[in-house]
């Protein structure tokens, strides 16, 4: 049965992607408000893929099934986030405007990848700083900030930036939570992100990711990781308005205390 679903789902998702590809077009030149857009927004409007409501539903359904069957399909997970997350992103936008830090992020639109971050400087920082902890996380888990997929299906360029920001900050959230990138760590982080951002894809990743845990992992998850994630997700401050790039030199434990984060006592 699972194989049959997979044979139906993958073509469905691919068909949805194929259907919308031909509608890609540059809209900036014909938009009278384009001159008020910043560089990120103008570039996004040139590269976005415009889709209809039906196509959005098709992509949402296909990508959700594909992501459930194979959580390693990051392309399907990314697609799911964009086709289901618009309402949550508008709520995040409101949160961004409630703080000076969040407002500056929306104006400056910083990016996190190897061409924008001086990783050599971060490596030289004291071990107890957030920047040093981030570099250590990347090395220990063999991940890179350059692996995030570009946003393509959101209509509003400001929401597209918020989704981009969420993706690029994912490893920073792992760092501040002191969670690895194994399945157990990812599920725990997804619960925190779900409660903190309200993004449907985070709830989906948390629920369906937990189903794939091995028996020993599931016991640890139910006894320790899930209660910890739910507590943190409910009590911590919003993470999206944090200007992480300005916190590199901050003591990582002081940053956690500021955000209301309690670390899990590893067992």
UniProtKB/Swiss-Prot annotation:
Query: What's an example GO cellular component term for this entry?
Result: extrinsic component of mitochondrial inner membrane
Q: How does the record classify its membrane topology?
A: Peripheral membrane protein
Q: Which residues bind Zn(2+)?
A: 170-171, 174, 186
Does Metal-binding count among this protein's keywords?
yes
Q: Which InterPro entries does this entry report, sorted A to Z? A: Coq4 (IPR007715), Coq4_euk (IPR027540)
Give the enzyme's main class according to its UniProt record, as a single word.
lyase
Q: Which reaction does it catalyse?
A: a 4-hydroxy-3-methoxy-5-(all-trans-polyprenyl)benzoate + H(+) = a 2-methoxy-6-(all-trans-polyprenyl)phenol + CO2
Q: What is its main location?
A: mitochondrion
User: What HAMAP family is this protein classified in?
Assistant: Coq4 (MF_03111)
Q: What more does the entry say? A: This protein may be expected to contain an N-terminal transit peptide but none has been predicted.
Q: What is the protein name stated in its UniProt record? A: Ubiquinone biosynthesis protein COQ4 homolog, mitochondrial
Q: Which organism is it from?
A: Drosophila persimilis
